[in-house]
Each structure stands twice: as C-alpha cells, then as structure tokens.
C-alpha cells in the first residue's frame, strides 16, 4: 500500500526512478519481459517483448540521438533459450537504467509511455490529462456532459500544484497544466470513481489517496464513490454553487462530508443562527444544495451536520447503519427521504421531524409498528417492503393519510395472510381506488370487494347503534340470509339448520372473509327503525305501475327488505325511496359467493340435500320416461287433455320442496302452450339421453355424488310463467340441482345462508336438451325436456364460462351435437361480437366501431312523481319533490306502453360503450323447439341507445342519508335526459364496476356533456323566488330569448353556403327557432325581455387553504352576466352565486378531477368551429386541468345526439326539481394545442386537435382577454413536467441541463408547456386594410388608409313586435382617418387550424357598410334599450357612398333591419360597444377626426 507523500516546501527532492527487469515469461512463440518500475513508494509492473524495446530504441535514436549500440543485439537462432533470456534480462535492465539516467529531468514521451508513466507517475498522468483536455475540453464543456476522473489523477494534479514547477516543463504546449486548471474552473458536472484494492498493476491504493477539489470553481453536481472522505479536501469551496452531491462507499459519518472542519473545532454553529454559547467556529451553509445522496456508506447516525443543508429536498441515506431517525427537523424543505436498508426499529414521533415529506422509503429495516406514520399527511409514496410487520392493524396507521397513493408491503409477515391485498386496501376506506399496492394496479374485483365491505361495515355500525341491549349474543353471531318479503299467503319454508355451520371460503375473485354481524347487516336495508317497528309490506302486483296518489299511506312507504331508506319517528323529513316493491326486487347477496366447490363442509351439506331429493326423485324420473315412451304415438288429442297430461308429467319429473300454495302460485298463471308434434329424431334423442342418465347403478349414484361446480346466480325460470329468484346451481356428475336463496322474512332474523337454502328441483344431464348463451358472457340458457322449461342463468362472465365448460365436459362428444342450439351462442362468441351483430341489426351508424366497456343486469325503475303521495304540506317545494317514493312502472323507449306492464319486473342489461348507454331487453318467453329456427333471431332483443353525455348520477340523492348495505351495494339513481331512473343491480360488485367504468367514460368524452347545477335551497324568499307567482322553470324558460339565427337583409344574390342545422320543433320550453342560411346571417343575440337579477345568497365559509380569499373575491366580482348577453335560468342561477358558493358549484357540478382547482371565471359569448353561425352565452371556468364552458340551453339541439321522446321530454319531475340541467363543454388543457389572439385583444380562440375542440371566446373587451390569457399561462406553467423523485435510468446529471423556456418568434410564443400563443401580425392588419380598400368606391386611396380603431361590437336592429329591445348583430367596427366601416368577421375559422384541409367557404372579412367621417352629422348617446348605445347619424350624401362596388342595401324596409330616416336624407347606425373603454375611445377618436375634417366640434346629443 502506497503512503501519501508529504506536502509543503520542506519536502525532500524527488527520488530517482528505477526500472528493473524482474523476470520473463513465454507467450505463444515469443518471450515477454516483466519490468518493475519504482517511483518513490509507488511501484508497478510493465510487460514488453524484445521487439517493443527495439521500436523504442529506434525512436530514441531518431529523436534524442542516443547511442545505437546501447540496446542488446537481436538474435535469430535460439532466441527463446533460457541462457539467452536470462542474459538479455540483465542487458535490458542496464539499458533501461542508462535511459533513465540520461534523462533525469523530463522523461521523453516515448519512454514515458513505454514505462506507463502516463498511468502511474505524477508527471505522466498530468501530461496525459492536460493533452486530453486540450483536445476535447471545450467540446465537453459545451455539451454539458459529466466528466469522469479518478482519484489518482486528482492526486497527481494536487501534487503537481504543490511542487511549484513550471506548468509546462516538457516544452510541449499540449501538456501544459493550465489546460487542466482552465477546464476545472468551468466544469459543472464531476464524477470521481475510485477502485477497491490496488490500482492496475501497481501497489497504489487509489481510494486512500488525498486530493483537493478546490480547483473546481463552478461545480453544480458531484458524484464520489470508493474514496476516503477523510482525505478529500476542498469540496466545501463549491458550497455556493453545488446543487447535487453524491458520496457512496466513502464515508463513515455525515460530518466527514458536510463539515470536514469539525475535526479541527470542538464547538461550531451554522452561519445565520443565533449563538447561545461560546463557539470556536461559524460554518457557512451549503447555500444551493438540494439533493444529497449518502447511500452505501457506514453512517450510523444522522448528526447535527444536517443544520448546514437547510435547502435539501432529496435525501438518500439508504444502505447504512442508522438506528434512529434524528435531527431531520432542521430540513424544512425535505420532500423525498430514503432510509431503506438500515437498522430502524421504531418510528415514534416521526411526524415531528418530517414536515412536508412526500416520498418515504423505509424498506429493509426492522419495523414492526407503523404508529409513527399516522400524521404524515403530505405523504404520497411509502415503501415498507422487507420489514417485520405482522398485524393488519398496523396498516390502519397509514390508511387515513389523505394523499397516500403508492404503498409497498411486500416480504412482510402480513403479506402471506389470505386476501392480503383486499384487506390492506380496505384500510384506506373511500380512497381505496386511489391507492396502488405493491406496484400492482388494483383490479376491479378487488375494488368492488372493498366497496361492498365498506357498505357492510357501515351497515354494521348503524345496526350496532340500533340493536336491542337485551338481544342475545348468540343471535348476533349468526349469518343472515338474503332479505325477502313474500305475500302474506305464502309463509316461508326454511330447511332445518345444520349442527355445524361451515364458514365461507375465499373464491378466486378475491372475496374477503367478513364478520358475521356485518353479513347480517348487509342483507337488510338500514334505516332508523328497529326490527320490531317495521311493518311487513303488502303483496305487490306483477306490474310496477304507479300507486294512485290517495293510496300510498306513509306506513306503506316505510323501509321494507328490498327497499332503501325510510321514514322514522325521529326524522324530521322523509327519505327517498328507490325500490318499487319488495316482492319484485330480487338480487344476489354478496355474502353467499364465498361458498364454492372447494369448501368441504358446504359440499357435504349440499350432497346431503341432493341425496335426499334423489331418493324421492328417481322413481319419478323413470315413471316420466315410461310415460313419454307410451305416449309417443298418441297424437291429435283434445287441447285440455294434452294440458292435463303435460301438467302431470311436469309434476312427476320435478321434485320441489316448499309450501303447497307457493307451488300453486308458481304452477298457475298463464296457460300452457300446446305441445308441438314430436318428431322421430327427438324421440330417439330422448331415449339415448335417458339411457345415459340412468345407466349407473341407483345405489352407487346415491352414495357417490360428486359435486363439480357451484354457481351462485340470478335465475329466471320459465315454466309457462316467469319466476325469478337468487339461486345456487350445483353441477354434479349425474345432473344439476337448483337451490333458491329465500328472502329474509323479518329483519330480526339472521339465518345462515346454508340453513336458508331451499331445494327447488333437480334433473339429470339426460333431461338437458339444449344449452348455450343467450347473450355471450352474460346469460346462460339451459333448456330442459320440453321447451316450456327453460333456465336463464345470469352471473358474472368468469363463473358462467367455467360452469359452461364444466357442463360440456359432462357430455361425450357425440352428445354435444344434439345439445347445440341454432338460436344460442357458444362459448367462443364474445360480447363484442354480439354487440356488433345487435347494432348491425338495428342499423346503427358506426356500430362496427363500438366497443363494449361493460354490461350489467339491472332492474330499471323510472318515476313520474306526480302520481305519488308527497310529504306534509309544510315542506318547501324542493323538499317535497325529493321526498316522494319512486314507485312507478319500468318504462323505456325500447318497449311499447303495452309491454311495460308485462315486462316490468324483468331485468334489463345496461351496456356501456365509449359514447352511449345501451339498454338491452331480452325476450325470456319460452324458447322454441330445436329445428324451428335456422338462425339467431335478433328480434328477441330490443335496444335503446342514450348518449352517455346525457347520463348523470341523480343529484337528488343525498350522500348523507343512511341507506343500508342493499342500497349501497345494489341501488344507483341516474338522470337520463330529463328522466329519473333507478337501476337496481342484481349481482354483487356490479354497481361499483359500473360506476368505475361510467366515470372513466364520462371523463374521456370530448363533446358537450350534461351537468347538473343545484339550485339554492330555501323558500320563496330565496333567489328562485324572485320570479313572480312561483311559476315553474318551464314557463320561465319560455320567456328567455334563445340564441337563434336570423337572416340579414340582402338585395343582391350571394352564393349559398352550408345551411344551418334544421331547427327543432317548438317545445314547451321555448319558442320556435327561425331557420336561416349560415352564410347570409350571423347569430343574433336577442336579449331577455325583462332582465331579473336574483339576490346573491349569503357567502359560505371558505376552506382554510383553497380557495384563497383573493380567489373568492375575484370570482365574485367577475361573476356578472353582461347585460347584452341572453341568459337561461341555469346561467342566471350561476351568476347569482357569490363567495365560496361559486367554488362549491364548480367542484360539485362541473369539475371532473377531484384535485383540480378553479383559477378564473369569465362571462363571454362563444362560437364553436362546428356551428360558426351560432353565438351563445357561456360561463367560462378555467381550472388547473381544463377550461369549462357552461353554455346556454339553446346549444343543446345543435350538438347533442337527439334523444327519443321518452327521454328528452321535460316532465313535472324536472320542472319541480331542485336543480337545473345545463350543457357544459370541456377542453382539457392537455388537449390544448394553440391559442390565437384576435386583433386588439377583442377575442381569442382555443384550438385542440379536432374540430370539436375549437372554440372562440368573443369577449369584445381587451381587459377580459388579457386577464384570461394571463391566468391561462400561469396554469399552463404549473402543468410542466416535474422531474421524477425516483431515480431513473438516465444520466446522473441530465436533470440539470437547459430547461425549455418560452420564446417569441414571428408573433408566436411557444409556451414552456408546448402550447403555441399566436398574436396578430402586421400582415393581418395589411390584409384587413386591403379588404376594406378593395370594396371602396375609390380604391386608389387605399395606400392612404390607416386604421385608428378596431373594435368588435353589435349593431342594434329594429325591435320585433311586442319587444322593447332590438336584436344585436355582431359586427366589427373599423375607424380609419377618414372613413368608418362595419364588417362581418369570421373569428372561428381564421387563422386556419392545423387539421383544416381546405379554406373555409366564408371570407374572413365581409364589408357590410362604410361611411365617410365627414358625412357624420351628429352622435346620439344615452340610456336607450342598451346602456350607452351610440347612434351615429350620417347625411346620406349622393355620389359619396363608399360602397360603390357593393350592391347590398342594408337600409331597406325589411323588418328587423336598420331603417332610413324620413325623406331619406339621413342614415342611422345604432351601435352597441360592450367595453366601456372601447366606447370612450371610439367617441374621442371619432370626435378628433371629425373636427380635423370639418373644422368644428362633433355634435354629441344625450338622449333619455
């Protein structure tokens, strides 16, 4: 090991260098000589063959003129003989010694390289480094690359600087030491990597060499590895600039790196702190250091040296020996901390040391408890893998952290617990869907299970509060069966409870174990009534028609099993009921699906029940088969005899357990259809099947029942009539058994699922004639002997597929051909293929591109609340509206009214596609016999499609109402168009799956979306009460003048362009629209006849941090609809809000992302690229994620896909509802590509990637435009990609390169977010001037034109009959030095978007009228129909019309247009300029120009 040379002037002269040949070795056919070179205490070896010596000698002779005979001669014969080699070793050693003695000062370059001085000797190392930097230094600095250097090189440079020799002793300018110093002064990124053990072939221990880093003056990042921190000097010289420091495999304490001065001073304090006692030194802090990596060292404690790094954000102390976490309270800016693979065993009080931490890595420690993490409220990423966490209760400490998104618990003892993932996710409650566990995306099944368990836990908590104190403990421990209310004439029959009740096991879907009390609560609807006080509901009819108003007593509407909510003596106001009738609602409870075919106790219980049934059933099967064989030839009997015989056969073939009245009710109903003639083929089929089914020995069959599959499902049994029930299908090796899950008779009972199962019937495989999928992946059909007996099985896709596959395996291949059906699907057809066929059958445009995102079986209930008894009359209208019961028929546009009663209680399927909600109704009538249909009949399905943009979650359901496990897990209220629909999901998990898919699809929609704007609650004195007589919203809406298109008067023909969309038929909501061509007209904004401003509600108390007081004040001030813009009731309500109510409205009704924040509000009229002729009022809301346009209702018919009358017709439910339905257009900031600013900031256009994402805001006010663009740029700047806190596979220093900044080029600002802001150029001004000059009567004056004022305004037309205000026509007013013009401008098509493939059909500017300023007679100004409207009165001077080449006459007597004055001597322009600043500027410039031209002041008259 080499020892370091002493530093300082008293160092002795350099010892002479020596070179000795210490041996040789034979390599291939030549001899290699081993040379040992000594330079002081450093030694290294070099190997050369004789030819290398010869080449060296030739060069030295040529360059340095040494003696030619100095080198031993070459031998041809016997050159490898031992004697010759030994003699040559001595001669070569003498040769090298003579060379070194001949050059004592500077060793020649060729000799230095021959002896590897450039690798191991100080002068050679520095010379080689200097030469390298001379050639590549500038290139390295310019590229900003990391420069890697070794400790030996730094040691050599340090030694050279200490010797005081000339910087270029060799005389070669390339090796001048100044090249190194020049490079180090400017280098920013440095990497010093040592080696373990001897360096190369030397004895130099590189990691122990001292070196000085003070020669580096501009370092931003330094990475040091495999060095000794005690021997590193000068690093502190980089404190002012160093931002990132990494020291690995080099330090034993943090002080060695951060405070090397600590070894010299006993007491020290960081600079800038208050000194409390005597100190020997004040140490400057690391002013710029934000990232510190001290991983893979031997650090045993976090000492007080961290006081010197107050700005640190990223701290990595992984792979050390830390025992406790200390002193981190001094790091106020610390965001990311890595303490992995240390020896931490306790985290107590960690929140007092870590304030704003976001990423915390504690992997590989000795942690058993997580209690110290419960207050780290800003934590986002947490890694706890490879610890000793055993108890699930420890996860609760982090389950309440509000920002936590990524958690890793792998390789802990608790990770081997069954259902570990689901149980951990359940600890996060409502945030379970936001948490990613163990770097694995949470599956939908896991999230659905968590949601159900949350509902169960909620129901359990409510039940524990309401439970009777005297209730026996044993009663609480029993599991509950599914809730059921039967007609009073049908008492339930419950199988005897078994002595030992097996526990449910986990299925492959990840269902968790749940507590028994929670299971009992989950299967009963929860309200404040105790079980003793709950009345049993009366029997419900088959149809779900509305209950007459006078018959719905309040007691009848209380909570019943299967219903949700309810009234309570303690409640001041009733709750919403959503279920039409308990007897009609069947659903599969969540608790049962934990029992599978792998649960031995469960299988044993089922086997016993099936065995008992078979003992009684086998004789009936044989007898039925004999009767069929005897009756095969008997045909042509009377119809009543056939029905009687068939009924007897059915009773003999199926053994049912249950009360007789139930069987009678099930067997009655509709008459049996006439049996079709049996063909010879069917008879042979039955005979083969019977032989196969009964081929086994009867005793053997009873003793060896093997259960293959258990399927929990929703079952529709068609046997003449339709019967539905939740069922358990058991597939055995001999046949199929059907069990029913009965409803719970009373809420007080909590029967176990197993003991509640009721055996219905069973049949052998031989009785199965057809089976397949009615709808792929959704509904499996089993057709039992005779077509009237059909089972429609509804379950999830995975279980249905497994059951179908297991059933197929029970049949021999030759039998499968007989069981295939031409009208059923096989297992290979996908749901996507079925959807494609269905849409093709209904001739849906683009149906082939539709992709199914999920399909869900539900009951659908829609309400017409006029038919329902409401609450007491002392409630306000809104409360009365919300408290009625949804008891009405299932009605959809896909079924006729006559079919609604017949199919009221049959489930439908809701199928979600990216753009639509598809309602599918299947035909569950008895299936025809085999052979009667050669193809699938798509008429058996009825389809209704609703645009997904019009489907909303019902806003009337209060999330604070106690609902119970049934409602939480199965019931969902929807608003479809104007209809309120309740969907009751029959399968567990499906509701939460539907919500997840629905929310994803809604967020991805790019068209107009429906939003709900809640009205301010209150009585008649509220803002809504400002309308006289409390007229309904429907009438109020009819008073609003909608945006419409009106024709402009034209005498000369103009080329016809694309016509406007045909107006919708006049509805009760508003007057008929006037059709007009789009080219010859622009939108006319017709104001409301009587503007009514609602008083603002009292401001609500604002949250602490967001929104800020400044934001609340600013939005309140900006939230005023300009008087000239028409407004519908929803927009007027939005404008009436003040204070934090605006923020609350944004988050509750408009915002799409949970964590987005409102930044700016603005009112403006907007024009969409797809409807250029329509200008509509909008409330523009800018958030941190998107720009939202809440639009006037008049735009709905232009954008939205037409709904069928049933959905689209407004009814009394909507008219009296406590909210408005409005349209909202969303432009995500991530889709924003460019912003085009109009001339003089009068408007701006936001452009996305598609035509539907282009919208122009016509602010007509430069201040509004400027404010919006300023806020938009701020928001876009915050969306710039931030560097990832986790290390990635890229260059260590790449994050500190040049960052993209905004730059202005050619009137385009490329924002740092890559959004392009385009401003008007001088060329656009020239185009406008040229356009005006071309239309003038004297175009030769065009060069003299200079634009003084450009403003977008309105021209006021003649008011229509019965109205006091005239329509406003958008115009562009242009004032030059001697003329004034009115133009029609296309603000949405220009400049052309990137996706445009051809120029627009309309010109950008179309001159409408022009007058000379000198012809202006006077200006009338006052408070006419519009505040501060200006009337410009011109003398109609003959021969001086500027519009000589324009034949349009805009001043004829056409109704609605401006008219000439009497005697035709005056022409009036009535102009309304919305911006007060622009209005004053127009008057002042006009007056100045008029005075310059006419020599006197412009007459300005004030009118009333």
Curated annotation (Swiss-Prot):
UniProt xrefs under InterPro entries: Leu-rich_rpt, LRR_dom_sf, Nischarin_PX, PX_dom, PX_dom_sf
Modified residue annotations for Phosphothreonine: 1282
Main location: membrane
Localization: Cell membrane; Cytoplasm; Early endosome; Recycling endosome
UniProt region (Necessary for binding to phosphoinositide-3-P), positions on chain: 2-133
Coiled-coil annotated residue ranges, if any: 634-695
GO terms for cellular component: cytoplasm; cytosol; early endosome; intercellular bridge; intracellular membrane-bounded organelle; membrane; microtubule cytoskeleton; nucleoplasm
Annotated Low complexity bias: 1063-1078
Tissue expression per record: Isoform 1, isoform 3 and isoform 4 are expressed in brain. Isoform 1 is expressed in endocrine tissues.
Interaction with PAK1: annotated segments: 245-869
Record's function text: Acts either as the functional imidazoline-1 receptor (I1R) candidate or as a membrane-associated mediator of the I1R signaling. Binds numerous imidazoline ligands that induces initiation of cell-signaling cascades triggering to cell survival, growth and migration. Its activation by the agonist rilmenidine induces an increase in phosphorylation of mitogen-activated protein kinases MAPK1 and MAPK3 in rostral ventrolateral medulla (RVLM) neurons that exhibited rilmenidine-evoked hypotension.
Free-text domain note: Both the presence of the PX domain and the coiled coil region are necessary for its endosomal targeting.
Designated name of the protein: Nischarin
Organism per entry: Homo sapiens (Human)
């Amino acid at each position: 090991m080499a020892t370091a040379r002493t530093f300082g002037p008293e160092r002795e002269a350099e010892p002479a260098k020596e070179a000795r040949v210490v041996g040789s070795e034979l390599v291939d056919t030549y001899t290699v000589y081993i040379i040992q070179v000594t330079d002081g205490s450093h030694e290294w070896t070099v190997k050369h063959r004789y030819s290398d010596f010869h080449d060296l000698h030739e060069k030295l002779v040529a360059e340095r003129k040494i003696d030619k005979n100095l080198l031993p001669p070459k031998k041809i014969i016997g050159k490898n003989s031992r004697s010759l080699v030994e003699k040559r070793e001595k001669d070569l050693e003498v040769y090298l010694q003579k060379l070194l003695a001949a050059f004592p000062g500077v060793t020649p370059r060729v000799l230095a390289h021959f002896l590897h001085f450039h690798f191991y000797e100080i002068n050679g190392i520095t010379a080689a480094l200097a030469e390298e930097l001379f050639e590549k230094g500038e290139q390295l600095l310019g590229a900003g690359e990391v420069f890697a250097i070794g400790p030996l090189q730094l040691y050599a440079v340090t030694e050279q600087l200490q010797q005081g020799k000339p910087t270029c002793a060799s005389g070669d300018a390339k090796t001048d030491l100044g090249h190194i110093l020049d490079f180090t002064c400017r280098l920013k990124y440095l990497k010093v990597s040592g080696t373990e053990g001897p360096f190369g072939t030397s004895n130099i221990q590189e990691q122990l060499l001292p070196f000085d880093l003070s020669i580096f003056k501009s370092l931003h990042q330094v990475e040091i590895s495999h060095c000794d921190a005690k021997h590193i000097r000068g690093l502190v010289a980089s404190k002012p600039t160093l931002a990132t420091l990494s020291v690995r495999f080099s330090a034993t304490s943090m002080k060695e790196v951060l405070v090397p001065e600590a070894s010299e001073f006993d007491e020290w304090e960081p600079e800038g702190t208050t000194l409390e006692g005597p100190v020997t030194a004040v140490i400057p802090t690391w002013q710029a250091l934000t990232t510190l990596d001290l991983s893979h060292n031997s650090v045993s404690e976090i000492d007080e040296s961290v006081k010197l790094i107050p700005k640190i954000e990223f701290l990595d102390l992984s792979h050390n020996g830390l025992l406790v976490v200390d002193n981190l309270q001094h790091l106020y800016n610390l965001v990311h901390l890595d303490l992995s693979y240390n020896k931490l065993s306790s985290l107590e009080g960690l929140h007092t040391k870590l304030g704003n931490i976001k990423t915390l890595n504690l992997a590989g420690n000795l942690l058993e408890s997580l209690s110290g993490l419960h207050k780290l409220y800003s934590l986002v990423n947490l890694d706890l893998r490879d610890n000793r966490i055993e108890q699930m209760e420890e996860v609760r400490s982090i389950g309440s952290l509000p920002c936590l998104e990524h958690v890793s618990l792998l390789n802990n003892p608790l990770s081997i617990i069954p259902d570990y993932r689901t149980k951990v996710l359940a600890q996060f409650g409502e945030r379970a869907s936001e948490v990613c566990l163990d770097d694995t995306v949470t599956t939908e099944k896991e999230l659905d299970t968590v949601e159900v368990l949350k509902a169960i836990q909620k129901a359990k908590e409510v039940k524990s509060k309401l439970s009777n104190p005297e209730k026996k403990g044993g009663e609480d421990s029993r599991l509950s069966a599914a809730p059921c209310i039967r007609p009073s004439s049908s008492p339930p029959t419950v199988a005897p409870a078994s002595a030992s009740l097996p526990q449910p096991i986990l299925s492959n879907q990840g269902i968790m174990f749940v507590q028994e009390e929670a299971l009992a609560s989950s299967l009963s609807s929860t309200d404040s009534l105790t079980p003793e006080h709950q009345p049993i509901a009366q029997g419900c009819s088959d149809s779900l028609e509305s209950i007459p108003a006078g018959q719905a007593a309040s007691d009848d509407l209380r909570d019943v099993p299967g219903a949700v909510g309810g009234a309570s003596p303690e409640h001041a106001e009733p709750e919403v009921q959503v279920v039409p009738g308990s007897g009609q609602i069947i659903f599969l409870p969540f608790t049962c699906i934990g029992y599978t075919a792998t649960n031995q106790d469960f299988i044993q219980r089922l086997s016993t029940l099936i065995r008992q049934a078979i003992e009684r059933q086998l004789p009936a099967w044989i007898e039925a088969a004999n009767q069929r064989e005897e009756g095969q030839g008997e045909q042509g009997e009377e119809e009543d005899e056939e029905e009687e015989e068939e009924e007897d056969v059915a009773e003999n073939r199926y053994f049912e357990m249950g009360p007789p009245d139930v069987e009678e009710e099930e067997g009655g109903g509709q008459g049996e259809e006439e049996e079709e003639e049996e063909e010879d083929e069917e008879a042979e089929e039955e005979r083969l099947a019977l032989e196969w089914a009964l081929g086994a020995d009867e005793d053997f069959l009873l003793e060896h029942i093997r259960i293959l599959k258990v399927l929990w499902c929703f079952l529709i049994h068609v046997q003449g009539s339709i019967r539905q029930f939740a069922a358990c299908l058991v597939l055995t090796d001999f046949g199929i058994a059907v069990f029913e899950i009965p409803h719970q008779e009373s809420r007080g009972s909590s029967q176990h699922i197993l003991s509640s199962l009721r055996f219905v019937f069973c049949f052998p495989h031989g009785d199965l004639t057809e089976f397949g999928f009615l709808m792929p992946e959704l509904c499996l059909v089993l057709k039992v002997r005779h077509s009237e007996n059909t089972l429609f099985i509804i379950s999830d896709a995975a279980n249905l597929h497994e059951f179908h596959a297991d059933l197929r395996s029970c049949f021999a291949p030759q039998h499968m051909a007989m069981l295939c059906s031409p009208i059923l699907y096989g297992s290979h057809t996908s749901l996507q293929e079925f959807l494609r066929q269905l849409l093709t059958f209904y001739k849906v445009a683009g149906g082939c591109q539709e992709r199914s995102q999920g399909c869900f079986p539900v009951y659908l209930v829609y309400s017409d609340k006029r038919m329902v008894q409401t609450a007491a009359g002392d409630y306000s209208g809104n409360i009365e509206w919300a408290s009625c019961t949804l008891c009405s028929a299932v009605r959809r546009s896909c079924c006729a009214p006559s079919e609604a009663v017949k199919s009221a209680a049959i489930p439908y399927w809701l199928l979600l596609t990216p753009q639509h909600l598809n309602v599918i109704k299947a035909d569950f009538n008895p299936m025809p016999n085999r052979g009667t249909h050669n193809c699938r009949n798509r008429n058996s399905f009825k389809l209704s499609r609703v645009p997904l943009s019009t489907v909303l979650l019902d806003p009337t359901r209060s999330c604070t109402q106690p609902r119970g496990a049934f409602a939480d897990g199965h019931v969902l209220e929807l608003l479809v168009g104007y209809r309120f629909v309740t969907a009751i999901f029959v399968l567990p998990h499906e509701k939460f799956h539907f919500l997840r898919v629905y929310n994803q699809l809604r967020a991805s929609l790019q068209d107009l979306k429906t939003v709900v704007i809640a009205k301010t609650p209150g009585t008649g004195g509220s803002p809504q009460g400002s309308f006289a007589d409390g007229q309904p919203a429907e009438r109020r809406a009819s008073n609003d003048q909608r945006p419409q298109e009106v024709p402009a008067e034209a005498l000369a023909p103009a080329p016809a362009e694309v016509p406007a969309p045909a107006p919708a038929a006049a509805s009760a909501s508003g007057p008929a629209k006037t059709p007009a061509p789009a080219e010859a007209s622009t939108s006319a904004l017709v104001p409301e006849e009587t503007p009514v401003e609602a008083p603002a509600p009292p401001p609500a108390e604002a949250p602490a941090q967001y929104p800020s007081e400044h934001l609340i004040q600013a939005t309140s001030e900006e939230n005023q609809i300009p008087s000239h813009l028409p407004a519908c009731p929803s927009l007027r309500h939005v404008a009436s809000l003040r204070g934090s109510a605006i923020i609350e409205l944004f988050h509750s009704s408009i915002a799409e992302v949970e964590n987005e924040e409102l930044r700016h509000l603005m009112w403006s009229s907007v024009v969409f690229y797809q409807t250029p002729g329509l200008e509509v009022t909008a409330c523009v809301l800018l958030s941190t994620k998107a720009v939202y346009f809440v639009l006037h209702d008049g735009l709905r018919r232009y954008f939205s896909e037409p709904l069928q009358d049933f959905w689209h017709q407004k009814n009394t439910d909507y008219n009296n509802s406590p909210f408005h339905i409005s349209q909202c257009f969303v432009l995500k900031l991530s889709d924003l590509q460019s912003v085009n600013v109009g001339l003089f900031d009068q408007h701006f256009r936001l452009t996305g990637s598609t035509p539907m994402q282009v919208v122009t805001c016509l602010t007509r006010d430069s201040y509004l435009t400027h404010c919006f663009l300023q806020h938009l740029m701020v928001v876009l700047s915050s969306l710039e990609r931030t560097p990832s806190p986790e290390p990635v596979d890229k260059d260590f220093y790449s994050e500190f390169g040049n960052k993209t900044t905004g730059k202005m080029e050619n009137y385009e600002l490329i924002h740092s977010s890559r959004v392009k802001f385009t401003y008007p150029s001088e060329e656009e001004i020239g185009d406008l001037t040229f356009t005006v000059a071309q239309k003038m009567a004297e175009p030769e004056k065009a060069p003299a034109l200079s634009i003084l004022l450009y403003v977008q305004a309105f021209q006021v037309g003649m008011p229509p009959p019965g109205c006091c205000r005239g329509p406003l026509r958008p115009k562009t007013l242009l004032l030059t030095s001697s003329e004034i013009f009115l133009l029609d401008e296309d603000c949405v098509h220009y400049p052309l978007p990137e996706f445009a493939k051809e120029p627009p059909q309309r010109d950008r500017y179309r001159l409408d009228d022009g007058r000379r300023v000198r012809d202006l007679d006077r200006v009338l100004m006052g408070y006419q129909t519009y505040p501060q409207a200006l009337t410009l009165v011109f003398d109609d001077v003959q021969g001086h019309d500027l519009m000589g080449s324009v034949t349009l006459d805009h001043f004829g007597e056409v109704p609605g247009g401006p008219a000439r004055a009497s005697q035709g001597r005056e022409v009036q322009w009535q102009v309304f300029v919305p911006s007060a600043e622009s209005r004053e500027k127009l008057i002042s410039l006009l007056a100045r120009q008029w005075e310059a031209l006419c020599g006197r002041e412009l007459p300005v008259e004030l009118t009333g």
